[in-house]
Curated annotation (Swiss-Prot):
It comes from Desulforamulus reducens (strain ATCC BAA-1160 / DSM 100696 / MI-1) (Desulfotomaculum reducens). This is Large ribosomal subunit protein bL34. Belongs to the bacterial ribosomal protein bL34 family. Keywords: Ribonucleoprotein, Ribosomal protein. One of its GO terms (biological process) is translation. InterPro entries: Ribosomal_bL34 (IPR000271), Ribosomal_bL34_CS (IPR020939). It holds the Pfam family Ribosomal_L34. It comes from the Bacteria. GO terms for cellular component: ribonucleoprotein complex; ribosome. GO terms for molecular function: structural constituent of ribosome.
């Protein structure tokens, strides 16, 4: 049986990347919260 998680860098960036976060209002809220929390890495 094949495992369910088959990581792909391109999809990872496209779905969870910085540009994707910036493209929606809620995504910008995510970045804002992560900045306030002091995350070293904001996105994938």
């Amino acid at each position: 049986m094949k495992r369910t998680y088959q990581p792909k860098n391109r999809r990872h960036k496209r779905v969870h990347g910085f540009l994707k976060r910036m493209s929606t209002k809620t995504g910008r809220n995510v970045l804002k919260r992560r900045r306030l929390k002091g995350r070293k890495r904001l996105t994938a």
